[in-house]
């Protein structure tokens, strides 16, 4: 708490068994650098580079690239953070995130008071409920954020049992996953979204 971390070089995590930073309540200055090769496949909820970004914390000017696809529990997932209650400024995430509930390209859940400004995602996100490119569930504020990634296309494209060329024979009970609250920027929001694009 109250500490400032300054990233002075790009970081490559491809050969590292990385454990998410449990909680962060200081200032993280990315200085435009990239953390690549983030891979999280172990069991557990609330996953990302950071598990929890706390109230009063700031993460800025950082790019994160990687893959998150945990075993077992798969809720609150995002490449940058599983949960954000602080400020995320001018950050970019690129890669693949797969899970169940509150799945976002950048952040799984943006808590009340949490803020994302000038952030962007590219890649693919797959989830069941509250799924989107920037934030899975938004209770805070999203400003000037953008998504250019694909959302929930994996199951539709890769399921050999699904024949979308014959809609008359489509059995939605069998072939279409029961996804809810899926969007481009935010899957579900009871917060504020302004000047965002998808």
Spell out what each predicted region is.
Residues 1-198:
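Surface-exposed repetitive/solenoidal architectures
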């Amino acid at each position: 708490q109250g500490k400032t971390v300054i990233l002075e070089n790009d970081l490559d995590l491809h050969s590292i068994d990385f454990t998410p930073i449990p909680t962060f309540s200081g200032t993280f200055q990315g200085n435009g650098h990239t953390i690549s090769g983030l891979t999280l496949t172990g069991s557990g909820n609330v996953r990302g580079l950071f598990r929890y970004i706390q109230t009063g914390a700031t993460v800025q000017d950082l790019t994160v690239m990687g893959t998150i696809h945990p075993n077992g529990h798969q809720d609150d997932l995002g490449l940058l953070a599983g949960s954000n209650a602080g400020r995320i400024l001018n950050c970019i995430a690129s890669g693949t995130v797969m899970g169940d509930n509150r799945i976002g390209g950048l952040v799984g859940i943006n808590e009340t008071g949490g803020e994302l400004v000038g952030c962007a995602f590219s890649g693919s996100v797959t989830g069941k409920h509250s799924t989107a490119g920037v934030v899975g569930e938004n209770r805070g504020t999203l400003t000037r954020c953008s998504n250019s990634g694909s959302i929930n296309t994996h199951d539709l494209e890769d399921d050999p049992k699904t024949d979308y060329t014959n809609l008359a024979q489509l059995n939605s009970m069998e072939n279409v996953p029961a996804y809810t609250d899926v969007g481009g920027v935010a899957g579900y929001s009871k917060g504020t979204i302004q000047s965002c694009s998808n």
